[in-house]
Amino acid sequence: MPVTVTRTTITTTSSSSTTVGSARALTQPLGLLRLLQLVSTCVAFSLVASVGAWTGPMGNWAMFTWCFCFAVTLIILIEELGGFQARFPLSWRNFPITFACYAALFCLSSSIIYPTTYVQFLPHGRSRDHAIAATTFSCVACLAYATEVAWTRARPGEITGYMATVPGLLKVFETFVACIIFAFISEPSLYQQRPALEWCVAVYAICFILAAVTVLLNLGDCTNMLPIPFPTFLSGLALLSVLLYATAIVLWPLYQFDQRYNSQPRRSMDPSCSRSYVQPNEVCNWDRRLAVSILTGINLLAYVSDLVYSTRLVFVKV
């Protein structure tokens, strides 16, 4: 049974494969993996920057992802090489794996969005070749970060930080999916002046905030500041999120695709999806509605899994 701590004075993960405060950290499996992450993200943004192939929102997102992941990975390597984990302002038990999970999801999204919405519309030539190569290195980075998550996640019977457990990793996934939902509903006309759809947007926002607060509490090692026991907080949060998303999974598709509510059940009925209207790197309204419906279902499954796994955790204080 997985074991986690609500508060700890230990600053390094017990499952770390690196030698803390030594150059040998770079020769251990986890250190070599982080070097691969560092190199692949650096090469990805360097290739794109050298030809300026990152204009527009999709290109900007990809460039931000690679630069951000490179910078934070470099900070983690410096911390471990210098043995500065005790001085790090965040919980070292929780920070590396939390970042690795976010980085894997960020790089995955860039590896999909960048080539499908940007690269394929570039003319053949040096810029396109560099963009394709950058996408390849983005995929490598995604695999490297996912491998780190697999290596450092909690094992049955192991004492570790909450973010290394399945519910902790699910919190990262839930917040990431919510951010994608927010991107798709950035067009207010999709839900304004329709109370049922506005309720769905409120659900996405409330659940995102609660999950993000959980992540921040663990990163700051502040779970003891809650007015209620942390396990109770987690169980209540997961149950509330499941109930809220259960309403959204019914209301959003119903009011977006049912003709009884003046919606378009087929893509061809939405004028914003006509070829003459949609720009190459834009998503039409019907596709946005469908994407949000799918992502709502995915996040509901994540919250259900979160609720189930949370009941299997044993919390101890050391």
UniProtKB/Swiss-Prot annotation:
Keywords: Membrane, Repeat, Transmembrane, Transmembrane helix
InterPro entries recorded: Marvel, MYADM-like
One GO cellular component term noted in the UniProt record for this chain: ruffle
GO biological process annotation, one example: negative regulation of actin filament polymerization
Membrane-crossing residue ranges in chain numbering: 35-55, 58-78, 95-115, 131-151, 165-185, 197-217, 233-253, 290-310
Protein localization: Membrane
Domain MARVEL: 25-157, 162-315
Coiled-coil residues: none
Annotated Pfam families: MARVEL (PF01284)
Membrane topology listed for this record: Multi-pass membrane protein
Main location: membrane
Family under the similarity heading: Belongs to the MAL family.
Protein name: Myeloid-associated differentiation marker
Source organism: Rattus norvegicus (Rat)
Gene assigned in the entry: Myadm
